Amino acid sequence: MGQYNFDQILDRTHTKSLKYDFAVKRGKPADVLPFWVADMDFEIPPELKQILLDRVNHGVFGYTESDDEYFEVLQNWFSTRFNWTPDRKWLVKTPGIVFALAMAVRAFTNEGEGVLINQPVYYPFSMVIDDNDRRLINVPLIKGEEMYTIDFEGIERAIVEENVTLFLLCNPHNPVGHVWTEDELKRLGDICIKHNVLIVSDEIHADFVWKGHTHKVFADLGESYAEHCIVCTAPSKTFNIAGLQVSNIFIPNDSLRRRFIKEIDRAGYSQLNTMGIVGCEGAYKVGGPWLDELKEYIQDNIQFTIDYVAKYMPKIHVYRPEGTYLMWLDCSKLPLTPKERDEWIINEAKLWLDTGSMFGVDGEDFERINVACPRKVLEEGLEAWRRAYETKGF
């Protein structure tokens, strides 16, 4: 038994929780069990909770800014956890990574230019491209039996043929769970440098990389790679504080950083909220032991899910994630269309998952499930799915 209790089940309803309180408004039955959005059902580290409470008890919430300690805590985290020591001048703070992606698209591309992604991929990647009137250039990942790989030749061909100027990379990859190796990242980087394509690397899930795999920060590949990239990080997934709206973006190239900041200024954004600053600094300062225990718990949940689905729902294939607490389930052997499958899961299993089509056409045969929850909640969800599976006679 560890220091922290991850078996505790918290009632998150009536807290204005996006995950729990908005099913009906999003067209779902009121009684679905949510395993969709990527936030966890665990209370934040108690040490961090106390830091936030102390700040609330102060009672004044005027304009707040980060100081030297904020950056030093960040730097220590990345140095200790990833053997990467960023320079302070590289840091640009934003209220979220999706906001940062949108700012990058606007700062470094023109309307009509191509922005490259690898679907299936986190759906806001597509949104920030489409909403800013850029051309979405998709080079799908190559689906393997146990994991996906990158179509390097397809990427280079698309860059040349489609006038691509920006590449949005997801590492660790959401939803397929692949942690790109150093060799893969360098090969991607070499292609992009050759054709003067800027890489924006979303590394929000970097703290959830599982045994046998290592996360490599893109900017740590070497100086030439660092000069051609933007690295997006945040404490939100790691410590379950997405609602505090804080991200840390690292841009080693001075010219790129100035252009990025100018685009943020044009959008009218100026500074983080008070609790975001306090929460981010506090999380990276005191949250390490909590995270280490949490990762063990989630890895057990991942193994439980793999074993359970293989035993009771064998027509569904689970991809073992190398990173993230999200699992990618191949439902292509079920005799259902994607629409029929989604309706079956929602209305009969009473589960709210992220349907694979949200991640692009290449995800239509899949469902994504979030297993960052107490074991009993996970068991309840999988048992409900099993009953619906058996009722269908699969």
Q: What residue ranges belong to the model's regions?
A:
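Conserved PLP-binding active-site segment in aminotransferase class I/II-type PLP enzymes
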Residues: 1-19, 28-31
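PLP-dependent class I/II
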Residues: 4, 27-33, 38-53, 85-87, ...
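Short clusters of hydrophobic/aromatic residues that line enzyme substrate/ligand-binding pockets
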Residues: 9, 61-63, 218
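Short regulatory "switch" loops immediately downstream of catalytic or recognition motifs
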Residues: 16-23, 140-143
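Conserved N-terminal alpha-helix of the aminotransferase class I/II PLP-enzyme fold
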Residues: 55, 62-95
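Short acidic, glycine/Ser/Thr-rich loop/turn "cap" segments at secondary-structure junctions
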Residues: 57-60, 104
